[in-house]
Amino acid sequence: MKIVDFVGPELIVPQLSAHEKSAVIRELADHLAAHVKGPQKIDREVLAKVLLERERLASTAIGEGVAIPHGKLDAVGKLVACVGRAPQGVDFDSMDGRPTHLFFVLVAPENSTGVHLKALARISRLFKDPDFRTRLMQAGDAADMYKVISDEDAKY
């Protein structure tokens, strides 16, 4: 599974303006809803609610400065994602107690459990690489961040 199949440079936010958990999720939901065209119009409020409800079950911050908020919403039509970066770090209730800097929002239609889980596993493996995380943090803009992702994808 290639990450570039469901995230493009237009779906990368290199400088999140939000400074707290729910605001980060809302900012990324807004960005995703504005840039993804599904079979139906993606309602940013509904998308944010789906992501926040999943977050209430357990934090999606996996440690090492990374969070993977995810959920299911039929309006997307297919697997979609949005990447965000918060250089200042955000308290995201991470397992390691450290601030979260990199966010990978993943949204899939309701009936796509297999694809959703494969994507989560692929993203988790990718973000376990400290060099990859460092390169994403040091990338200048959305295009540079996308290049880091696509270069890593080429190895897969």
Regions found by a protein language model. Give the residues of each.
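Cytosolic covalent-transfer regions centered on His/Cys nucleophiles
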Residues: M1-Y156
